[in-house]
Amino acid sequence: MSTAEQRLRLMQLASSNLPVGGYSWSQGLEWAVEAGWVLDVAAFERWQRRQMTEGFFTVDLPLFARLYRACEQGDIAAAQRWTAYLLACRETRELREEERNRGAAFARLLSDWQPDCPPPWRSLCQQSQLAGMAWLGVRWRIALPEMALSLGYSWIESAVMAGVKLVPFGQQAAQQLILRLCDHYAAEMPRALAAPDGDIGSATPLAAIASARHETQYSRLFRS
């Protein structure tokens, strides 16, 4: 696959039109807004930076790097172990359901894009979108850092668009937020990908509480 094709594949994977349900979940933000924890753009940016620094950089990216290497080596046992670890790091039923639902949706895409994906790997990809992204990145020969950029941009954009609906704020403010959050992501991503095993784990208790409370929130825009 040429460099141009690989870049276009990355854009497709980061697209908001990718049918994996990214915009269906708020990851606790909806409750945080109702509770008065996030009331304006500045509070949203602080909230999202905390989720990135103490969650995405310490769980998602380090585990994505391990899944990618397991896929490179064809080590299904290691990939299964790290996927199970990822699900264990999702601290609420809602977050685990999101992970599994996104994985199942991505696996359906994978069946169309790469129908020769071996059944054990396809079954694993159904449990987590990160596993599917890792397998596909290796198959399409897209390097780990580039895949991580696509993954991060998709996560940032989904979070900001949830903020637009919930906080709320306008599209111009949203684009400024995406720029700043992307700058922070790009600066810290290499360190997160290289994190040792002992550093893996989240430290976002408020996000976990918000997600748990969202499961029984009276009126919701987002899935639970």
UniProtKB/Swiss-Prot annotation:
GO molecular function terms noted in the UniProt entry: nickel cation binding
Keyword Iron: no
One GO term describing the cellular component: cytoplasm
Phenotype on disruption: Cells do not express urease.
Primary location group: cytoplasm
Localisation per UniProt entry: Cytoplasm
Domain of life: Bacteria
Keywords: Chaperone, Cytoplasm, Nickel insertion
Cystine pairs: none
Matches recorded under Pfam families: UreF (PF01730)
InterPro entries reported in the protein's UniProt record: UreF, UreF_sf
Region (Required for interaction with the urease apoprotein-UreDG complex): 210-224
Subunit structure: UreD, UreF and UreG form a complex that acts as a GTP-hydrolysis-dependent molecular chaperone, activating the urease apoprotein by helping to assemble the nickel containing metallocenter of UreC. The UreE protein probably delivers the nickel.
Protein family per UniProt: Belongs to the UreF family.
Additional notes on this entry: The artificial UreEF fusion protein binds to UreD-UreABC apoprotein complex, and UreG can also bind to this. The UreF portion seems to function normally in nickel transfer, while the UreE function is impaired in the fusion.
Reported function: Required for maturation of urease via the functional incorporation of the urease nickel metallocenter.
HAMAP family with a match to the protein in the record: UreF (MF_01385)
Name by which UniProt lists this protein: Urease accessory protein UreF
Species assigned in the record: Klebsiella aerogenes
Name of the gene this protein is made from: ureF
